[in-house]
Amino acid sequence: MKVTAVLMVAVLVLTACQLTTANTTDYVRRIPARKSTMSRRECSESGEWCGLDPALCCGSSCFFTCN
């Protein structure tokens, strides 16, 4: 009986998490101005921090700093 109750609570929590996530992505999709500012990025010059994401650099190579 207790196991059933725990499983039911777990399913309800997971369902609530999925609904919250779906609602957030729908909110971003409905606001074009917010979506465009999130997708638009300036590129970093040589020597600036980029982590390991080459999309942040104006060039194509990135290893913690733009090359």
Curated annotation (Swiss-Prot):
Keywords: Cleavage on pair of basic residues, Disulfide bond, Knottin, Neurotoxin, Secreted, Signal, Toxin
Main location: secreted
Pfam family, one: Conotoxin
Family per record: Belongs to the conotoxin O1 superfamily.
Signal as UniProt keyword: yes
Protein name in UniProt: Conotoxin Cl6.7
Highest taxon of the lineage: Eukaryota
Residues that make up the propeptide removed upon maturation: 25-39
Native source organism of the sequence: Californiconus californicus
Localization: Secreted
Keyword Disulfide bond assigned: yes
Tissue expression from the record: Expressed by the venom duct.
GO cellular component, one term: extracellular region
MF (Gene Ontology): ion channel inhibitor activity; toxin activity
Free-text domain note: The presence of a 'disulfide through disulfide knot' structurally defines this protein as a knottin.
Endpoints of the signal sequence: 1-24
Disulfide bond entries: 43-58, 50-62, 57-66
